């Protein structure tokens, strides 16, 4: 019986495994649709961990809507090269990498294989070094970019973001089904943008998690001070939004 040892073998996987071998845990923030606050939550979690003195990285992989740098107030510049590329440094020693470091504020007109190759290239050349935690801001939905990320970053733990909207929750249920069928580790579900009025529509914890094996991590109320704190890390840390996000992330680390 003969077989081809190159079948289904991608040498880049070995490189990626080496890149992340000194990263303690990797949390990938995902959502079934846009507009649920995934990027703000990703940034808040990373800032909270960095402020605690944890060695933390933040990877903004929302190819078509990168915005984490806006929350951080980080100036984008082409990363320094040293046998790879080094992440930018943001507030509190947070290591930060974004597709926007290469594209600026321009759109990225890529699709299919081009997106996959760009993802693999950026993952393979970025040198994170020793990290306690890496937070990944994933693209919304379940397209090629998301599937590629969870395929190649095997240590990922998925954290799913929803809102009280019935539409959002139903999309999250479908997303959960996909991740469970792919045998991905799902850290839990967070419900964002909860208000008194929205709370009347908010589904039960069992409905949000959709499966006994997927914990419901908590609800984050609407924060009226969040908008004016964008771009000011010190001010962001004072908001109820970041404080609540920090409590949730601390509960799973």
Indicate where each model-derived feature is located.
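Extreme N-terminal, non-catalytic leader segments
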Residues: 1-32
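Helical mechanochemical/support elements of P-loop NTPase systems and associated helical scaffolds
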Residues: 19-22, 41, 45, 63-64, ...
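Walker A/P-loop phosphate-binding motif and the immediately C-terminal alpha-helix
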Residues: 25-62
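Conserved beta-strand scaffold positions in the cores of enzyme catalytic domains, especially
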Residues: 25-26, 58, 94-96, 216-219
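Phosphate-binding loop that captures ATP/GTP phosphates
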Residues: 55-105, 109, 116, 120
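Cytosolic-facing regulatory segments adjacent to core modules
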Residues: 102-143
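Conserved catalytic-core segment of NTP-binding enzymes
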Residues: 125, 133-228
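C-terminal boundary of histidine-terminating zinc-finger modules
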Residues: 230-242
């Amino acid at each position: 019986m003969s077989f081809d040892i190159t079948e289904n073998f991608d040498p880049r996987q070995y490189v990626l495994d080496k890149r992340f071998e000194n990263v303690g845990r990797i949390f990938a923030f995902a959502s079934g649709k846009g507009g649920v606050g995934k990027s703000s939550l990703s940034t808040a979690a990373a800032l909270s961990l960095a402020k605690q003195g944890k060695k933390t990285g933040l990877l903004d992989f929302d190819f078509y809507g990168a915005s984490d740098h806006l929350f951080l107030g980080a100036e984008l510049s082409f990363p320094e090269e040293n046998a790879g590329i080094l992440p930018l440094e943001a507030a509190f020693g947070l290591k930060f990498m974004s597709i926007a470091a290469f594209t600026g504020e321009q759109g990225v007109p890529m699709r299919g294989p081009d997106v996959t190759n760009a993802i693999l290239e950026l993952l393979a050349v970025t040198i994170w070094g020793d990290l306690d935690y890496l937070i990944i801001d994933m693209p919304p939905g379940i397209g090629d970019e998301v599937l590629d990320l969870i395929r190649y970053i095997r240590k990922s733990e998925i954290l799913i973001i929803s809102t009280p909207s019935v539409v959002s929750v139903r999309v999250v249920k479908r997303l959960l089904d996909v991740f469970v069928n792919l045998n991905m580790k799902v850290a839990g579900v967070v419900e964002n943008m909860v208000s008194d009025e929205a709370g009347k529509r908010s589904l039960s914890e069992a409905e949000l998690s959709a499966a006994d094996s997927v914990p419901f991590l908590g609800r984050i109320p609407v924060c009226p001070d969040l908008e004016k704190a964008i771009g000011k890390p010190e001010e962001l840390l004072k908001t109820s939004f970041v404080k609540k996000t920090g409590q949730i992330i601390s509960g799973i680390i």
